[in-house]
Amino acid sequence: MASKQLWRWHGITGDGNAQDGMLWAESRTLLLMALQQQMVTPLSLKRIAINSAQWRGDKSAEVIHQLATLLKAGLTLSEGLALLAEQHPSKQWQALLQSLAHDLEQGIAFSNALLPWSEVFPPLYQAMIRTGELTGKLDECCFELARQQKAQRQLTDKVKSALRYPIIILAMAIMVVVAMLHFVLPEFAAIYKTFNTPLPALTQGIMTLADFSGEWSWLLVLFGFLLAIANKLLMRRPTWLIVRQKLLLRIPIMGSLMRGQKLTQIFTILALTQSAGITFLQGVESVRETMRCPYWVQLLTQIQHDISNGQPIWLALKNTGEFSPLCLQLVRTGEASGSLDLMLDNLAHHHRENTMALADNLAALLEPALLIITGGIIGTLVVAMYLPIFHLGDAMSGMG
């Protein structure tokens, strides 16, 4: 996928008519070969820039949902893809859908046609569509896949929105502190110093801090810059990402949010693949391919290894230490009763509802702590600012 380039061409068809079009090709040479196969004599070729934002998961899920609707209405797969290509507002999506329709006309299975486009359609898409092809229920598999992707996206957006709240509050508090340190407090201190009396210890300490931060601000900026570079370099190391994720999961409330989001994703995809008839190991592989966090990828790899060595599913989950006793009990019951897909779906619903509720209540849960922290900092600065005024009467009477 990364090597493919999008080209706009203008040429003459075999019957002598002028025609325009767009094609994906890995090079100009391969583009010319593809046009030759279509009996097109190119007159001009232009490479088109690719907008990576168009490959977001919500775009892919929307296309799959629309395709499922067309299949349900009785259109063939190639007809549905061709119709979607005509109606899609994005040029690169039009070219992609036309390419898939062309592959189908050449006798290539839809699931195999998606293989070169794993950046757009992850392995989960390919596995579900392959299952739909084998069972003759492609429309149902596409509907279920689109529903799962939409629900997962809504949960992810909800968690991100909830986590932004404390960050915004703390950022505003820092801005207020900086403004008071560098603009307000020095003015009060200058007025008080005209009386030639020493500043109160609290005010003097904060003024010293303000002077230091002003004098050595370049050093603080340099330190922040170096810290950002170090973090960027560390983010490329899987070992650091694993340690970082473990630490984040230990943070109260926020850790529960992040864990709930990941467990919802895991159980939702496993329930989806199980109900479609895909083996559990293949389902775990589909989950692993959708994960971007090395820590959870490591856990899923461990689960795959344990199950491959003959351990029951519930025990493989238990060995990771990230699944609650409720998860283990329901999975164990599902294994024993043959209703694993139902139990996985129940777990997905359970974690989704709990995580959504926690995200909705995050502001109320964090508000007391945030108020104490920000109120304590700003309150200390206000006291330091007005302490000299409280002592002003003593200073003036001393002068008298």
UniProtKB/Swiss-Prot annotation:
Its main location: membrane. The keyword Transmembrane applies. The chain crosses the membrane at residues 165-185, 209-229, 370-390. Keywords: Cell inner membrane, Cell membrane, Membrane, Transmembrane, Transmembrane helix, Transport. It is a multi-pass membrane protein. NCBIfam families: PRK10573.1 (NF007861). This is Protein transport protein HofC homolog. It comes from Escherichia coli (strain K12).
